[in-house]
């Protein structure tokens, strides 16, 4: 006969009163959100089998990890790869063997973040293109390379860049305004090419700016 385990105490969290610490057979077992207690029908005196307890512990670890990741994504939009890498870092630091090693737990957290729309590479790419070096100036080529390094698919990057949010011509003009006093035409063109701009476009705009000086 399978052994049952009794819920002998439930205490509200001190740091987070919306979370409760659950004690099984007078020993701390796990913590859950209050809504999870209701969903799982956990109350004082409830009895559960071992597989139930394991399910609750998974839900507990999932809830804490998901909340941490959620708060992290609220700081600014993130790419799916950025989130996956960050998740690996914080789970590797966990004191829990289960959290450190469970691929299922990590996959569940990522799946929830994506399904709820908190991770969306297209939205991230648009945010990145709209906000990266807006005053300093940046080439489409460099934006594409940076987004590739963040794990965004090239098809998504191309689609976003083709929306015309940023144009190389306008970006070059920004850089010329900032760098003109320090560089002659040749050095300024070389600098622009190193930044990923087309040589012909850079040369034409630099020469045009010289004529108007």
Residue map of PLM features:
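An alpha-helical, amphipathic repeat domain used for nucleic-acid recognition
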Residues: 1-213
């Amino acid at each position: 006969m399978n052994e049952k385990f009794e819920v002998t105490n439930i205490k509200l969290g001190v740091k987070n009163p919306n979370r409760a610490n659950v004690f099984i057979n007078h020993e701390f077992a796990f913590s859950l959100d209050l809504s999870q207690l209701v969903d799982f029908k956990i109350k004082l005196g409830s009895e559960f089998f071992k597989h139930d307890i394991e399910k609750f512990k998974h839900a507990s670890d999932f809830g804490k990890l998901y909340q941490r990741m959620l708060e992290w994504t609220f700081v600014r939009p993130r790419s799916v790869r950025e989130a996956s890498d960050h998740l690996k870092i914080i789970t590797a630091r966990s004191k829990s063997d289960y959290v450190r090693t469970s691929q299922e737990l990590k996959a569940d957290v990522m799946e929830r973040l994506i399904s709820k729309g908190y991770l969306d590479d297209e939205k991230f790419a648009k945010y990145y293109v709209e906000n990266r070096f807006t005053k300093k100036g940046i080439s489409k080529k460099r934006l594409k390379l940076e987004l590739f390094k963040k794990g965004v698919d090239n098809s998504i990057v191309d689609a976003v860049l083709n929306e015309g949010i940023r144009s190389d011509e306008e970006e070059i003009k920004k850089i010329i305004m900032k760098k003109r006093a320090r560089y002659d035409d040749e050095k300024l063109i070389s600098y622009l090419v190193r930044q990923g701009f087309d040589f012909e476009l850079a040369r034409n705009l630099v020469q045009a700016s010289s004529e108007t000086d």
